[in-house]
A protein has these predicted regions:
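N-terminal secretory signal peptides that target proteins for export/translocation
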Residues: 1-4
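Sec/Tat signal peptide C-region and signal peptidase I cleavage site
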Residues: 22-27
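Structural recognition of the beta-strand scaffold that forms the well-ordered cores
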Residues: 31, 56-59, 82-85, 112-113, ...
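A mature extracytoplasmic/lumenal domain signature
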Residues: 36, 59-63, 85-89, 115, ...
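Signature of lipid phosphatidyltransferase scaffolds
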Residues: 42, 120, 127, 131-182
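Primarily the HKD phosphodiesterase
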Residues: 46-109
């Protein structure tokens, strides 16, 4: 009887193992791009365009018309977009940074600036709580066309994205809402 009981238990365990639901496992992928060759900007834009739920951007210099346009289009697609930028680099009256922030704010995208640090030098985009774009690439024309820069996208790595989201949130809480100025 003991032997029969063991067989039944073993059969039951094997059945449970074979037919138990398997959690989805994602294999992270990594892609690098460089400028001024153009692949860094394309990676940044692709990160924004492929977002399905949320985009959290934090940046130092923000003057890129292409990135500004892509973020506005994402907002128009229903994506939850929020942008956090260094105050000193982007707030000079009449600057391209002010123009870009005004465009975002007028499109209904919450924009905040941070001034508590000598510079807020982060350059990162987190999308859908699982993808991270980071590197030296500023979201600017100079980064795309003149500077030697790099961008790295790590896709399908929720634990890494969560680490970056916590950092982003800590800076967001320090930030001040951008008021549109003309």
């Amino acid at each position: 009887m003991n032997r029969t009981l063991r067989r039944w238990c073993l059969s039951g365990l094997i059945s449970l193992t074979l037919f138990a639901p398997v959690p989805a496992v994602y294999a992270a992928s990594i892609e690098a791009g460089f400028s001024p060759e153009g692949s860094a900007l394309q990676l940044v834009l692709n990160t924004i365009v492929t977002a399905q739920q949320s985009i959290r951007l934090m940046g130092y210099s923000f003057t890129s018309p292409e990135v500004t346009r892509a973020l506005i289009q994402a907002k128009q697609r229903g994506i939850d977009v929020r942008v956090l930028l260094d105050w000193k680099t982007n707030s000079a009256k009449g600057s391209a940074g002010v123009a870009a922030m005004n465009l975002l704010a007028n499109a209904g995208i919450p924009v905040r600036t941070v001034s508590q640090f000598k510079i807020m030098h982060d350059k990162v985009i987190i999308t859908d709580g699982r993808n991270v774009e980071t590197g030296s690439f500023n979201y600017s024309r100079a980064a795309a066309n003149s500077n030697s820069e790099n961008a790295l996208v790590i896709r399908d790595y929720p634990a890494l994205a969560d680490t970056y989201l916590k950092h982003w949130q800590s800076r967001w809480e320090m930030g001040r809402d951008w008021s549109v100025s003309y």
